[in-house]
């Protein structure tokens, strides 16, 4: 029996170029850290279905779905933790190798679709099957950057955006359309992740704990 749910792929932008232009040992460690940072924050209602090279494929069964706002915040938090990990590695490294110098070429994009699937058992593994399962993988190949200038984004199919009522929950979305062989025209909505990071940094600037401060000053005042 077919189920319904959301399919989510997080994909490291610039992965291929970065890997081919960098020393493998350090590049592997850096990419592993970025994957691990995401994996630690992938929690219910998200379930990991598999890995595709530079991408993590997840899904949320409709029965496990919480609410649109929580779902969107989960995706936003994944981006924040990804970029925090990347920036920390940039800040802390003194290594002059290409892998460490080129960390800033990496970013994250997400593709989200909603539809039907069935679960197929393969030994001790489960795999999702269905035409809708294919859609987010195809959405990874797009012209979003060229046509919108948005480099870090969550790309929602129109079906996913409508089901989530994104127009009521988030910042203005950018309409986008791609044409894929066998799928035809796929209408989408682009959610810019840059403001998500900026807002997170603004909240951090408003409060710095003593433990996180680089410099602290304590002074006894006269009674």
Segments predicted by a language model, with ranges:
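A generic fold-level signal
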Residues: 1-2, 51, 103-105, 128, ...
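Catalytic NTP-binding/metal-coordinating core of nucleotidyl cyclase/transferase enzymes
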Residues: 1-77
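Context-gated lysine
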Residues: 4, 40-43, 47, 105, ...
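Catalytic beta-strand-to-alpha-helix segment of the class III nucleotidyl cyclase homology domain
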Residues: 64-175
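Intrinsically disordered, glycine/charged-rich C-terminal tails and inter-domain linkers
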Residues: 145, 149-223
């Amino acid at each position: 029996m077919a189920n319904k749910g959301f399919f989510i792929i997080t994909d490291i932008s610039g992965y291929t170029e970065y890997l081919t232009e960098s020393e493998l040992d350090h590049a592997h460690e850096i990419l592993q850290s970025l994957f691990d940072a995401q994996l630690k924050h992938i929690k219910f209602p998200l379930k990991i279905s598999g890995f595709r090279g530079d991408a993590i494929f997840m899904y949320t069964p409709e029965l496990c779905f919480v609410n649109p706002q929580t779902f969107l915040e989960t995706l936003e938090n994944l981006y924040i933790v990804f970029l925090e990990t990347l920036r920390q590695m940039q800040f802390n490294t003194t290594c002059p190798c290409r892998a460490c110098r080129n960390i800033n070429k990496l970013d994250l994009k997400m593709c989200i679709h909603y539809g039907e699937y069935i679960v197929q058992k393969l030994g001790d593994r489960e795999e999702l099957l269905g035409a809708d399962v294919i859609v987010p993988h195809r959405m990874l190949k797009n012209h979003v950057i060229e046509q919108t200038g948005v480099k870090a984004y969550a790309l929602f199919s129109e079906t996913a955006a409508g089901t989530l009522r994104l127009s009521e929950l988030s910042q203005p979305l950018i309409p986008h359309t791609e044409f894929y062989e066998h799928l035809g025209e796929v209408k989408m909505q682009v959610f810019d992740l840059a403001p998500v990071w900026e807002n997170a940094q603004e909240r951090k600037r408003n409060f710095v704990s003593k433990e996180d401060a680089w410099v602290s000053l304590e002074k006894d005042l006269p009674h």
